[in-house]
């Protein structure tokens, strides 16, 4: 079933007609025009169920192998559609992030499923996650990419934090050190501040985080 929002693919010089009944968004949505096929495909991908939570029970090597197999499978299905090269290349990247964002939850699920194991991510898992760039501005409109970004910087930036008191500062520093794109940096810092406010019912204790936010996210045209 579709959520009440869906990413669309648009391209200069191409046309797209959208038909939808607001009272039945999921059941009535369809597309026409030169980009109708691509956007119908994206709708199908949003509905498709391709990830089984039982995968989290696999050991690290088996899990990463399964994630790579899922990516290969979805890419082959995409290539069989014979869409234009520009969309196909972008969609291959989005597919990777759609798997990676689910894979990023593996350590948490693994520890919950096997609490006595004291699991810590090894090089196989860490290398797999780090193979997905966090500086991919072309995909900032894709939810899978944005979700992966947030998960990844939270995982990396909160390492070594003492409890939860200053973990946001560590994440902010990680963003400053690793993110090159001003657009991506602004998105991540905005989400980090928003999450801090929600978790702490305000901005008390967020002096450093807010100083970074104001420095990096101020509109230069104002």
For every predicted segment, state its role:
Residues 1-87:
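A non-transmembrane, solvent-exposed segment enriched in polar/low-complexity residues
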Residues 56-178:
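N-terminal, charged low-complexity regulatory/assembly segments
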Residues 84, 180-184, 219:
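Generic structural signal for alpha-helix starts
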Residues 87-96, 184-189, 205:
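Residue-level detector of well-ordered alpha-helical segments, enriched
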Residues 100, 104, 189-194:
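Conserved small-residue packing positions in alpha-helical repeats and bundles
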Residues 147-150, 182-190:
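Generic helix N-cap/helix-start motif at coil->alpha-helix transitions
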Residues 169-186, 197, 203:
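Long, charged, low-complexity terminal extensions
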Residues 194-222:
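N-proximal helix/coil linker or "cap" segments that precede and/or mark the start of modular domains
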